[in-house]
From Swiss-Prot:
Carboxylation allows a single lysine to coordinate two nickel ions. Its main location: cytoplasm. Heterotrimer of UreA (gamma), UreB (beta) and UreC (alpha) subunits. Three heterotrimers associate to form the active enzyme. The keyword Cytoplasm applies. It comes from Prochlorococcus marinus (strain NATL1A). Coiled coil: none annotated. It catalyses: urea + 2 H2O + H(+) = hydrogencarbonate + 2 NH4(+). Its cofactor is Ni cation. GO terms for cellular component: cytoplasm. This is Urease subunit alpha. Its EC number is 3.5.1.5.
Length: 569
């Protein structure tokens, strides 16, 4: 006779199972478990009197015979491909199995072998996501990296050299000298890193040398002059050397309008930053570019989501970041031209429709590096409140919406920048960059951040206490964030051309250097659950935005979840 147990008791012991629903933090978003790959009555769990003991759930096999290094038991995975309950096996820093863990000598259906060489992380009651990817980083100060890691970001792509005036405004690491120094600096940080060279040049040789020096992409920024000639030159080099191009277009429309930029791009793949326009870009209608099939549009988090405070805070941020003078009327007019209620409101809806594919931070250059994930799910919450369930969802859950929004900060930036073979999702063979969340803190405070198979960050209590949990509990770096443990658990992304040219050896880099690949063969259709291409029109007088003829508008939020309730200091 099988033993029967109530759903509540089961969830409290092994975590939720198929059909169970979970509210995410203080949002109105409801997740429902779609599948459970663990076997009822044969679940593995660690602890006194529990299953993972020698001869029971722990096998006699050696590591050489397939035993994993780490098992995360009874994890609830939220990823673009599904919402499933499973055990996760990690070996050599990569995800080696998703399914049923245990001892094949005593249990059936085991595809993750637990042995004496296996560490256990209790995933019961936790939600697991892939480490987030922030693809719009101004590397202004190194302290950003700890803040990002503490929020669940494990990969940072962008440009900069520190608090230089150019870096404060643009995500560019210009030239071989600066690229080399940043690659060497990356050795000391416990996240994956990649650096963009400056793409503003009509002389292709000036761009090629940056890619060959180790840039993983090129960035076109209006503060350096994003002219049609520069756009064409930069994309030509990118096509030749297989790196992505990111663009911040011409707010002032000095060298042309959005139609001229589209013409200069010539149908080639490009990642458009802050495509709504408040972060910069052709005023007032850069947003229409999100309907192009070759354009991968992203947002930065200062406009995520639209709130009562969004417009007011932007003006001062703009003046500081772009080295503008409030005493000069033209500078003030430039800043004001970028801040439009109508396009910011439309941006919320375009994200919900899956027309905007990525959300990133714009760190310290109008964006907040530690709020990429929280702003993403604040937007999802606001859209559910204002627009109701998506057509793909029902009254029981918001699964499709959740998968759409998690994709914006994980798999889609990975695909866009040619690194999805390594990171961006919870899939076998990828780097074990995983974030564990307690449901009550989902999106705002990770419980554990696993980096390359080792714990890099965790909520931890008083180090002098007799157990790990006494107050004050707060996020702290863990062992793999220190010393030589960083090198085998983190990747540095370079162009394949730079790796073939021996840049890692010449710079004596110890971290694994991985090439970006296939950035030029992708399109909007490559974006998971975010590939909609509506025809966008903007009224030049009122700034109203229309998608396929329908007006896109919504009210600003007066309050938000994932905010001050969790952040008292």
């Amino acid at each position: 006779m099988p033993f029967k147990i109530s759903r509540q008791a089961y969830a409290e012991t092994y975590g939720p199972t198929k059909g169970d629903r979970i509210r995410l933090a203080d949002t109105d978003l409801i997740l429902e478990v779609e599948q459970d790959h663990t076997h009822y009555g044969d679940e593995v769990k660690f602890g006194g009197g529990k299953v993972i003991r020698d001869g029971m759930g722990q096998s006699q096999q050696s590591r050489d015979n397939g035993v994993v290094d780490t098992v995360i038991t009874n994890a609830l995975i939220l990823d673009w491909w599904g919402i499933v309950k499973a055990d996760i096996g990690i070996k050599d820093g990569k995800i080696s199995g998703i399914g049923k863990a245990g001892n094949p000598d005593t249990q059936e259906g085991v595809n993750i072998i637990v042995g004496a060489s296996t560490e256990a992380i209790a995933g019961e009651g936790s939600i697991i996501t892939a480490g987030a990817i922030d693809s719009h980083i101004h590397f202004i100060c190194p302290q950003q990296i700890e803040t990002a890691l503490a929020s669940g970001v494990t990969t940072m792509l962008g440009g900069g050299t520190g608090p230089a005036t150019g870096t404060n405004a643009t995500t560019c690491t210009p030239g071989a000298f600066h690229i080399s120094r940043m690659l060497q600096s990356a050795e000391g940080f416990p996240v994956n890193l990649g650096f963009f060279g400056k793409g503003n040049a009509t002389n292709k040789a000036a761009l090629e040398e940056q890619v060959r020096a180790g840039a993983c992409g090129l960035k076109l920024h209006e503060d350096w002059g994003t002219t049609p000639a520069c756009i064409d030159s930069c994309l030509s080099v990118a096509d030749q050397l297989d790196v992505q191009v990111c663009i911040h277009t011409d707010t002032l429309n000095e060298a042309g309008f959005v139609e001229d930029t589209i013409k200069a791009i010539k149908g080639r793949t490009i990642h458009t930053f802050h495509t709504e326009g408040a972060g910069g870009g052709h005023a007032p209608d850069i947003i229409k570019i999100c309907g192009e099939s070759n354009v991968i549009p992203s947002s930065t988090n200062p406009t995520r989501p639209f709130t009562l405070n969004t417009l007011e805070e932007h003006l001062d941020m703009l003046m500081v970041c772009h080295h503008l003078d409030p005493k000069i009327p033209e500078d003030v007019a430039f800043a004001e031209s970028r801040i439009r209620r109508e396009t910011i409101a439309a941006e919320d809806i375009l994200h919900d429709l899956g027309a905007f594919s990525i959300i990133a931070s714009d760190s310290q250059a109008m964006g907040r590096v530690g709020e990429v994930i929280s702003r993403t799910f604040q937007t999802a919450h606001k859209m559910k409140v204002q627009r109701g369930a998506l057509p793909e969802d029902n009254q029981r859950n918001d699964n499709h919406r959740l998968k759409r929004y998690i994709s914006k900060v994980t798999i889609n930036p990975a695909i866009a920048h040619g690194i999805s073979a390594h990171v961006g999702s919870v899939e076998v063979g990828k780097l074990a960059d995983l974030v564990l969340w307690k449901p009550g803190f989902f999106g705002i405070k990770p419980d554990l951040v696993v980096k390359g198979g080792c714990i890099a960050w965790a909520q931890m209590g008083d180090a002098n206490a007799s157990i790990p949990t006494p107050q004050p509990v707060h996020g702290r770096p863990m062992f793999s964030s220190f010393g030589k443990a960083i090198s085998p658990t983190c990747l540095t992304f370079l162009s394949e051309n730079a790796i073939d040219a021996g840049v890692p050896e010449r710079l004596k880099l110890e971290r694994t250097c991985a090439p970006v690949k296939d950035t030029r063969k992708i399109s909007k259709q490559s974006m998971k659950l975010n590939d909609a291409r509506p025809k966008i029109e903007v009224d030049p007088q009122t700034y109203e935005v229309f998608a396929n003829g329908e007006l896109l508008t919504c009210e600003p939020a007066e309050s938000l979840p994932l905010a001050q309730r969790y952040l008292l200091l």
